[in-house]
């Protein structure tokens, strides 16, 4: 029998809403981020996990630092980032909300302990 799961963002706590865990996803990572106005997210890359990521911006505006470049992001913008690129989100005056989806390029996803 086919199965589905539903999560409500307003019932998930924190700046990082752990959708993968809430929905029981096992093949890829997926989280919802809600950065308050002017906040900076974690600067990181995905070299250790070899994880390619896609960010779908759904509300607010801001910038995504990718290596030495900055990309203006906001509602309706979608960005893909290679694993080795260092990235850091920065929320604008309205805050910034996005969905992050990721999976390793070799296809062997291992859920992180934090998410």
Residue ranges and their predicted role:
Residues 43, 64-65, 81, 87-93:
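Short beta-strand His + acidic residue motifs that chelate non-heme Fe in jelly-roll/DSBH
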Residues 1-29, 36-37, 110-115:
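A short, N-terminal "cap"/entry segment at the start of jelly-roll beta-barrel domains
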Residues 68-84:
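Short acidic-glycine-tyrosine-enriched beta hairpin
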Residues 39, 54, 61-63, 70, ...:
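Structural motif
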Residues 20-22, 42-48, 90-91, 111:
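Short histidine-centered beta-strand/loop micro-motifs
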Residues 32-35, 47-64:
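Short, conserved beta-strand element in jelly-roll/cupin
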Residues 10, 88-115:
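Double-stranded beta-helix
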């Amino acid at each position: 029998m086919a199965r589905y799961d539903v999560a409500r963002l307003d019932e998930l706590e924190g700046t990082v809403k752990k959708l993968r865990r809430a929905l029981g996803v096992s093949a890829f990572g997926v989280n919802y981020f809600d950065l308050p106005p002017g906040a900076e997210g974690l600067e990181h890359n995905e070299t250790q996990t070899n994880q390619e990521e896609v960010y779908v911006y759904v509300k607010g505006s801001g910038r995504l630092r990718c290596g030495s470049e900055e990309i203006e992001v906001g509602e309706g913008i979608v960005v893909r980032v290679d694993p080795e690129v260092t990235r850091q989100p920065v929320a604008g005056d309205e805050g910034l909300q996005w969905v992050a989806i990721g999976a390793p390029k070799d296809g062997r996803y291992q859920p992180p302990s934090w998410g």
